[in-house]
């Protein structure tokens, strides 16, 4: 007979993911044991297995949820804008904002993805490619100088995502530059450079002091 779900199943499920994410990021996925997970979640091992059948399943759920949320945020940001530039800026804002709120998840996706099975890795990578494709398509539409061609498209895309994906290693969203201002800096620097002339910003979240 199938086991019945508790009334707070979804809340406990999410609590496990949140606690596991913190544990994996601080202690390391490979060093964290099921016993450590149970302690962090304040659950017995048996209760933990009621929600996930393995430590790997928990890691996959964390990464899958994070990347799907990023896709949803990027698509929502793009849908609210009409011009390509505003859509591009909104997409970068969405990525920066989520990464600023989820540095642990970003750290796990960069460092621990390879601990998943090949099939699960491909699932996550396929979702990541959707984000890259969304942003790269906008970037290509903004290129009025013909710099982005088949030979250079991936290089330009990875230059941009390199800045975004590894910002958790040095960027403090609680510091002097908030996520909205940082996102604008990324867009302006990537599209116009230090010496270039930046276009007016339709998407502005930062306030001047």
Predicted regions and their residues:
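Hydrophobic alpha-helical connector segments
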Residues: 61, 75-104, 156-160, 204-208
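Short secondary-structure transition hinges
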Residues: 90, 100-137, 144, 169-171
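Hydrophobic/aromatic residues within well-ordered alpha-helical segments
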Residues: 12, 55, 66, 70, ...
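Amphipathic alpha-helical segments enriched in hydrophobic/aromatic and basic residues
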Residues: 24, 29, 33-34, 45, ...
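Short hydrophobic/aromatic patch on the recognition helix
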Residues: 41-52
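Basic, helix-initiating cap at the start of DNA-binding domains
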Residues: 1-27, 32-43, 57-60
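Hydrophobic/aromatic-rich alpha-helical bundle segments in the mid-to-C-terminal region
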Residues: 106-110, 121, 143-189, 197-209
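Amphipathic alpha-helical packing segments from all-alpha helical-bundle domains
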Residues: 68-71, 75, 119-144, 154-158, ...
